């Protein structure tokens, strides 16, 4: 998010004790002014505190609109998944110090519980529909993205889903879907489209895990309706769990986790056999734009402050 302090603020999942605590991630906070130089700010949402367990992916939203009536307009509200013995539940917390630390919201209780102990219900993406006066949640649910609405940010009702099963995609699915994100973008021809980003597995298409997108529109319940088949944002094997920030109606900033669970389950060693203290990193930041090309709308990316020749 872009803070009132003049910085852009980002979070990534950190597990500093991954060898002995393999599932214990928490939110680590960094900030930047130029998207090239980042300042560490420490852990913002710690694991195993305030009633939640490990802290997984989520999103943040500011309260500039005053939607959260019981919070100051300067508050930043985070929604995130926590893995518990009873399932994957969605929690919320708020910050009053530019995202450096967070206080449990809703009394530290889940705002939305997983359907069963073993079901996939995670990675909430939150956005505000000012016209309806609702807060919307996109939630990764196996082979679909569930859509929920709330009038207070605490109680949620199911509105529908974007199905990403084999049947919906013409016979080939994308495996487990994660990290949904929705952006509204004006294309090169002046048309405004909704773009749904998500993480998935392209093994049935001869590819690996990666970040995908579909171009489409929203129905009257804010459920995304695809007008195109999924495409990859990046063809590499190490661009996953992406973060997106809307810079303007034509440009979205994006960066992602440089990692792949196909080889990150164990140690990474150098030529001398020394074990790395880090399993992965964060990619360079890109500017994403939507271009009309060959009768379709496609995402183009170029590195921030980079040479145009590096565009893909």
Label each residue range with its predicted role:
Residues 187, 246-250:
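A short, structured loop/turn motif at beta-sheet edges
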Residues 56-61, 179-182, 241:
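Signature of short aromatic-glycine-proline-rich micro-motifs recurring in repeat-based ectodomains
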Residues 236-246:
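Catalytic and ligand-binding motifs that coordinate phosphates/metal ions
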Residues 1-123, 128-173, 186-235, 258-311:
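Beta-rich carbohydrate-recognition and catalytic domains
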């Amino acid at each position: 998010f872009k803070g009132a302090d003049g910085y852009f603020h980002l979070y990534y999942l950190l597990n500093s004790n991954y060898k002995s605590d393999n599932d214990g991630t928490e939110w680590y906070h960094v900030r930047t002014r130029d998207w090239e130089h980042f300042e560490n700010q420490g852990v913002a949402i710690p694991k195993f505190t305030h009633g939640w367990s490990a802290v997984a992916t989520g999103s943040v939203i500011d309260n500039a609109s005053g939607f959260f009536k019981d919070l100051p307009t300067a508050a930043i509200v985070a929604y995130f998944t926590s893995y518990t013995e009873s399932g994957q539940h969605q929690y919320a917390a708020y910050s009053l110090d530019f995202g450096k630390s967070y206080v449990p919201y809703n009394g530290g209780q889940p705002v939305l519980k997983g359907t069963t102990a073993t079901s996939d219900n995670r990675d909430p993406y939150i956005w505000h529909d000012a016209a309806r006066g609702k807060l919307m949640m996109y939630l990764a649910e196996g082979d679909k993205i569930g859509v929920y609405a709330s009038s207070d940010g605490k109680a949620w009702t199911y509105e529908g889903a974007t199905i990403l099963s084999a049947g919906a995609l013409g016979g080939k699915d994308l495996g487990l879907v994660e990290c949904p994100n929705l952006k509204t973008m004006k294309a090169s021809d002046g048309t405004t489209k909704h773009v749904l980003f998500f993480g998935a597995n392209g093994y049935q298409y001869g590819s690996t895990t990666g970040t995908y997108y579909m171009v489409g529109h929203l129905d009257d319940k804010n459920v995304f309706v695809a007008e195109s088949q999924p495409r990859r944002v990046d063809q590499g094997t190490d661009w996953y769990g992406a973060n997106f920030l809307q810079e303007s109606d034509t440009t979205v900033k994006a960066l992602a986790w440089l990692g792949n669970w196909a080889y990150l389950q164990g140690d990474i060693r150098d030529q001398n056999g020394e074990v790395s203290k880090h399993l992965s990193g964060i990619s360079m930041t890109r500017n994403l734009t939507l271009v009309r090309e060959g009768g379709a709308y496609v995402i183009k990316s170029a590195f921030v402050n980079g040479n145009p020749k590096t565009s893909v």
